[in-house]
Amino acid sequence: MLTIALSKGRILDDTLPLLAEAGIVPTENPDKSRKLIIPTTQDDVRLLIVRATDVPTYVEHGAADLGVAGKDVLMEYGGQGLYEPLDLQIAQCKLMTAGVTGAPEPKGRLRVATKFVNVAKRYYAEQGRQVDIIKLYGSMELAPLINLADKIIDVVDTGNTLRANGLEPQELIATISSRLVVNKASMKMQHARIQSLIDTLRNAVESRHRG
């Protein structure tokens, strides 16, 4: 049995057509089903529907053989028990710092609000910058507006939400897309099956990119 961990939303919607190229189609619509384990048209493949931030945990610990996760999630997770063999080139966006539009660069210790705490620590450590990191789970844009933080670190797609709240994107930390991740033990135990799937997905991505 091959178990693939996916999260609902944009990543799931963009991943399903790629899996279909490999003949893997869920027998129920994951967006409408309440089931968290969904069979597919291949008897030996099932889908696990989990939170986006939990995908690498399920894969690293072997509860899933493969998964699809955003590079932002993988950067924050930082686990070592994963292979990352393929950039699926879907759900593309940017991980950036942002601050109040036109505000001067803060002097001294910087206050940064983000849910990407580990990413923020590494980013500012590389700059040698002293920071206080404030963990938030949502509505990041509020933090600079109410003086909770000087800057935020968040995923930016169009930047419209930032601009609507008087903020501007500033420094690019990473360009983000969704990646296929594979459990290391599964890759050894089911190498032929998983490698075949990786190759099929790679061909589908390249074909879509050429098109």
Swiss-Prot record:
Pathway membership: Amino-acid biosynthesis; L-histidine biosynthesis; L-histidine from 5-phospho-alpha-D-ribose 1-diphosphate: step 1/9
Pfam family, one: HisG
One GO cellular component term: cytoplasm
Record keywords: Amino-acid biosynthesis, ATP-binding, Cytoplasm, Glycosyltransferase, Histidine biosynthesis, Nucleotide-binding, Transferase
Source superkingdom: Bacteria
Reactions accelerated catalytically: 1-(5-phospho-beta-D-ribosyl)-ATP + diphosphate = 5-phospho-alpha-D-ribose 1-diphosphate + ATP
Keyword Metal-binding: no
Presence of keyword ATP-binding: yes
Enzyme class: transferase
Any GO molecular function: ATP phosphoribosyltransferase activity
GO biological process: L-histidine biosynthetic process
Signal sequence extent: none
Location of the protein in the cell: Cytoplasm
Enzyme Commission code(s) on record: 2.4.2.17
Domain notes: Lacks the C-terminal regulatory region which is replaced by HisZ.
Function: Catalyzes the condensation of ATP and 5-phosphoribose 1-diphosphate to form N'-(5'-phosphoribosyl)-ATP (PR-ATP). Has a crucial role in the pathway because the rate of histidine biosynthesis seems to be controlled primarily by regulation of HisG enzymatic activity.
Family classification: Belongs to the ATP phosphoribosyltransferase family. Short subfamily.
Subunit structure: Heteromultimer composed of HisG and HisZ subunits.
Protein name, entry field: ATP phosphoribosyltransferase
